C-alpha cells in the first residue's frame, strides 16, 4: 500500500494541476493507494505566488482579503473532509475551479452550494465549517508540514507502507515521476539513500527525491 501526501497552496492553479496529476495516478495504479491533499496555511503562502502561476487572486485582492479568503476556504475544506476523504477532495477541487477558473467571488452561499453538489450533509457542513474541530484539524496539518520539512507548495511525500516507515519527498509533481515511484517496489528509502550517496549522485535519476524521517 502506498500513501501520498500532496502539500498545496489551495488557491494556486499549478497546485490544482498537481491535484489532477495525483488523482490520475490513484486511478491508474494497481496497488492500494491512499491520497491526502494537505493545505499549507501560513503567511508566506498567502502572500507569495510560489508556483509562479500568475495568480490573479493575489494580484487583485488586498492582504486582508486574501487572508480571509484562505481562512474560509481551508476551514470549509476541513469541514467537508469530516464527511469523507473523497467528498472532501471533490469539494476542494470544485471550490478551486470556481475561484481560480471561473473567477467567481467567494461567499457562504457558494460554499453551501458546492457542499450540496458534492453530496455533503449540508446541516453538518454548516455546523462544522467554523468549529474548533476544523480549526484544530488545520493546526495538525501545519504540524505535518513542519514535521515533513515541506518548504513550498506542490510537494509530495510518498510512503511505501510495506517497506519503510520513512517517506520520500519530491517537488517534481509529474505523472511519470510519481507513477513510477509508486509502482517501483524497490524504491525503498534504503535504495534511495544509496542512490543519493556522493558516489552515485551524478549518475542517479533520483536527484529530485529526498528522504523524510
What are these regions (language model features)?
Residues 9-19:
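Short, thiol/selenol-centered motifs that function as redox-active sites or metal-ligating centers
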Residues 13, 44, 165:
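Flexible, glycine-rich phosphate/dinucleotide-binding loops
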Residues 18-103:
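Structural alpha/beta surface segment adjacent to cysteine/selenocysteine redox centers
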Residues 5-8, 21-26, 102, 106-213:
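C-terminal cap of thioredoxin/glutaredoxin-like
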Residues 1:
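Active-site-proximal cofactor/substrate-binding loop regions of enzyme domains
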Residues 11, 81-84, 130:
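Short beta->alpha junction loops/turns
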Amino acid at each position: 500500500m502506498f500513501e501520498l501526501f500532496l502539500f498545496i497552496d489551495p488557491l494556486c492553479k499549478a497546485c490544482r494541476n498537481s491535484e489532477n496529476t495525483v488523482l490520475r495516478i490513484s486511478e491508474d495504479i494497481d496497488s492500494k493507494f491512499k491520497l491526502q491533499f494537505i493545505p499549507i496555511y501560513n503567511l508566506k503562502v498567502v502572500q507569495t505566488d510560489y508556483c509562479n502561476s500568475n495568480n490573479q487572486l493575489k494580484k487583485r485582492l488586498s492582504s486582508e482579503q486574501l487572508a480571509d479568503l484562505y481562512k474560509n476556504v481551508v476551514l470549509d475544506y476541513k469541514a467537508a473532509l469530516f464527511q469523507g476523504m473523497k467528498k472532501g477532495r471533490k469539494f476542494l477541487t470544485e471550490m478551486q475551479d470556481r475561484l481560480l477558473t471561473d473567477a467567481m467571488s467567494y461567499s457562504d452561499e457558494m460554499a453551501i452550494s458546492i457542499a450540496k453538489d458534492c453530496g455533503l450533509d449540508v446541516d453538518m457542513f454548516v455546523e462544522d465549517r467554523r468549529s474548533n474541530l476544523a480549526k484544530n484539524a488545520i493546526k495538525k496539518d501545519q504540524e505535518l508540514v513542519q514535521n515533513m520539512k515541506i518548504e513550498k507548495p506542490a510537494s509530495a511525500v510518498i510512503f511505501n507502507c510495506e517497506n519503510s516507515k520513512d517517506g520520500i519527498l519530491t517537488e517534481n509533481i509529474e505523472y511519470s515521476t510519481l507513477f513510477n515511484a509508486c509502482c517501483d517496489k524497490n524504491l525503498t528509502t534504503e535504495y534511495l539513500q544509496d542512490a543519493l550517496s556522493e558516489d552515485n549522485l551524478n549518475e542517479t535519476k533520483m536527484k529530485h527525491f529526498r528522504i523524510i524521517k
